[in-house]
Swiss-Prot record:
Protein known as: RNA-directed RNA polymerase
Xref: PROSITE patterns: RDRP_DSRNA_REO (PS50523)
Native species: Rotavirus A (strain RVA/SA11-Both/G3P5B[2])
Swiss-Prot/TrEMBL keywords: Magnesium, Nucleotide-binding, Nucleotidyltransferase, RNA-binding, RNA-directed RNA polymerase, Transferase, Viral RNA replication, Virion
Taxonomic placement: Viruses, Riboviria, Orthornavirae, Duplornaviricota, Resentoviricetes
Names of required cofactors: Mg(2+)
Amino acid sequence: MGKYNLILSEYLSFIYNSQSAVQIPIYYSSNSELENRCIEFHSKCLENSKNGLSLRKLFVEYNDVIENATLLSILSYSYDKYNAVERKLVKYAKGKPLEADLTVNELDYENNKITSELFPTAEEYTDSLMDPAILTSLSSNLNAVMFWLEKHENDVAEKLKVYKRRLDLFTIVASTINKYGVPRHNAKYRYEYDVMKDKPYYLVTWANSSIEMLMSVFSHDDYLIAKELIVLSYSNRSTLAKLVSSPMSILVALVDINGTFITNEELELEFSNKYLRAIVPDQTFDELNQMLDNMRKAGLVDIPKMIQDWLVDRSIEKFPLMAKIYSWSFHVGFRKQKMLDACAGTLKTEYTENVDDEMYREYTMLIRDEVVKMLEEPVKHDDHLLRDSELAGLLSMSSASNGESRQLKFGRKTIFSTKKNMHVMDDMANERYTPGIIPPVNVDKPIPLGRRDVPGRRTRIIFILPYEYFIAQHAVVEKMLIYAKHTREYAEFYSQSNQLLSYGDVTRFLSNNTMVLYTDVSQWDSSQHNTQPFRKGIIMGLDILANMTNDAKVLQTLNLYKQTQINLMDSYVQIPDGNVIKKIQYGAVASGEKQTKAANSIANLALIKTVLSRISNKHSFATKIIRVDGDDNYAVLQFNTEVTKQMIQDVSNDVRETYARMNAKVKALVSTVGIEIAKRYIAGGKIFFRAGINLLNNEKRGQSTQWDQAAILYSNYIVNRLRGFETDREFILTKIMQMTSVAITGSLRLFPSERVLTTNSTFKVFDSEDFIIEYGTTDDEVYIQRAFMSLSSQKSGIADEIAASSTFKNYVTRLSEQLLFSKNNIVSRGIALTEKAKLNSYAPISLEKRRAQISALLTMLQKPVTFKSSKITINDILRDIKPFFTVSDAHLPIQYQKFMPTLPDNVQYIIQCIGSRTYQIEDDGSKSAISRLISKYSVYKPSIEELYKVISLHENEIQLYLISLGIPKIDADTYVGSKIYSQDKYRILESYVYNLLSINYGCYQLFDFNSPDLEKLIRIPFKGKIPAVTFILHLYAKLEVINYAIKNGSWISLFCNYPKSEMIKLWKKMWNITSLRSPYTNANFFQD
């Protein structure tokens, strides 16, 4: 503890360095005598500062508080006006400002011109192309960097080099910004026309990216990469990231494999010492040299040289530098184009009649057959999900935009909103709700568009379709996904697997007579050719399925689904262009349908099968695996003879020629040793992930608060760090300080302490130790957690008013009545709460809640409420367990090879000692018998929290719960009377605890918790038969051991002597654990 608080104190003296500035620390304690001293100390501090007296004497007088109590927050006063950043910046602005080359980008507005040249008037101006979309400002970012630099100017040795590298890069940034002045943001952290008009348009987003990069510089290589990207991204806002990351798709094919991990029959990773040579035809090197040439043409010097130097040996040892370049390229920021250009890219696809009809037919048939295969069983058995598809759709209706703003009446309140869920309610109330009619999206009612921005790729468009499309597709798509879940070809959906499993799949079949074909089909998805054959394949499949059933409701579901496909074959989109709204015919597939992911995978599989069936006419091979994963597909082909350069050359050219015959603009490559797809790449038999999450620029604005964004920032930093891109932790902590501080008045600000931000309460933002989730068990920690729980849920007047209106009530009642066969308060209340929670995406409500949250927080941070909550948290459970464990030193040898080279050393060490896991631990209760029983008869999906509540009820209440959801009485009776029920109790508790302990997030998801090597460090004598207690004791012990190893790089063993008398008490407590949602858990979830 304490590192954060120390930096916080230094940061405050750095920011408020004038005479008038005062810092008042606020302490608290769970000990009532000490707590009184804390209160006295605080009031005397306020008294003294009001009278302009020094606080130094008080610090001595109240030494007991400072020594023994816990810091709660720091209150800072400053009467200084705000030109502080500019003043400090001058000191660093000693270099030559960058001059943007205004001819680099094809589109005029992507050149970094002075804003008033791009937008002559305030009316024309938009910040949408450069909006950092994050609730922190450029001035804060500059402050954070300057704070770090000032703090480290006296570093020595290796640290001094880091300081000098960063100082040098910051000089470039500071000089450029200083030339134009620091742009001031408004209250919403946006940059308005008056501020920007005389400055380069992309100044802010470029500076944010540059700061993010320079604060991630450690080595000399980092420095060279960063410098080049910082300088060039000032001018090149369009293609830089793409140019720098392109070579990777070829580099992965150049590294020999000397030992790798493969997936065995039990789906575990197993080391295999196979040696495989990378066989590379000359043509591949020509293509690579072409890419390096393009990089040099764009002004890159050092990066292409690094790649060139690596090519001499092509060793896996030096490959992490290539991985680093690949990751860094994304940190130049998002490419944000105008919607018109985003559409143009996909619409200008060259259309030709000169295509191979035979292949198209095959492609369409494969899609048709796959759709039939996926849905055959549920349709034949008149599955209840397909019968009640409308209700299922309503229950999972999102609160995203429905494409247009409407005036809605809720009781006496009239509001304007675009949200789907509100539109459904309003339509029902006004008898406009007609899910049986799918509105057309033709020239009369074109589709409004959303956008998706990614670094290094062009902006993609998203359809915002009317909610009827969602309702029509939901149930059918769910059934498709269930099929995909147990079909290994669908890497993305395959049951509880993670990326490591897919990695072992690829390496498993590689040998000297195989090659792997990998294709990026993202262009194919949006090419006009994909519309007719694709939609027709789905329609033909649905027609076949319609003949397999006589159930009117199932037929209706299939029919509505078919209608969505027919409508979308004739689709138009609307694009605002200035004041006019352009309508453009749009043939292709865009995301925004419920089926996007599933249908894309189906089409993708059909595509690669079509291509393989063609080239099998020329070459003789066996297909060992085919996988599709999002926009990518790959296949391992096995030949009768050893693979030669010539063979690769031939296969490669044939594959490309085959794709060309379908007029598919795809990037197809063939290699013997590695692949590169969007999500991961395999080189030299090792797996790599791109560490490309931007920290100081966001893709879009949502309704998350500053606290949420601080937690997301931290979470992004952790993911990047696990993937090999490390940003200075002190800088991240400084950002968290800035983003979690609360302004009381203009000159008064409150900064929460580490304890507040790291205790798992509803306010948790980060972990005091990276990769280790701590559950505080000391008196002070539990005390503050309880205090925060007292003000967890915030009310919103608007939300209450809407929820009280008949429109809302009738909607909830309607859902309950359609779903339930008899009264069931748990479910009815659950639905009402879910619907009310969906209202949070309506801005006025989230604002209102945020205000309430902040005022409660302000009170709390100045003096914790003495509140004895009776709720039990996971902390209480662990606190009960802790005293019964004794620790001793232990030793575990390193026994596994590295396969993820980018991991931080301390995490790598643990995997090398205890092994990794290739599966997700089930933490949602879906595998339990009760969950399966419910889904067999009902479309309702209870959450893990609800299952946990239900399974601990009396048996007859469980029966009633089941019967009300339409489970036949005989099944409900059988369930409660069987052994399965008691197994379920244990199983659901297990899932619930795993869920609370975030076992599938952060670096915990990489460790094998069932490793025998880990088990042997834990000794717990078996007493009595309470499996749940044994489980929690073991899990606690494993986490303790692993956390200790992450922190210290050595192992301990734990012995637990848990008294039998305590076991039953603990067991009872375990059925009353409250789950805590915080910005931190949301950020974890957000990563998914």
